[in-house]
Amino acid sequence: MELVLKGQNFLEAGNFEDALGYFEQALLLNQNDPELWNFKAVSLRSLGRYEEALECFNKSLEIDPRDKHAS
């Protein structure tokens, strides 16, 4: 998915606000992908928005309890 790739590129470059925007757009299209919730959580955590990040990690675990990235 192009939105996810752009988000990952921004995340890797340290541009967390832009990364977050792309992951939020991707989630509008697919809210059942635990990886997207993890990417959003990492972006939020990097921005110091820890409570929101925790909510996203928890959402990822709700979708896939075996998700090693969110646990």
Regions found by a protein language model. Name each.
Residues 12-13, 46:
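Register position in tetratricopeptide repeats
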Residues 25-28, 58-62:
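Conserved structural position within tetratricopeptide repeats
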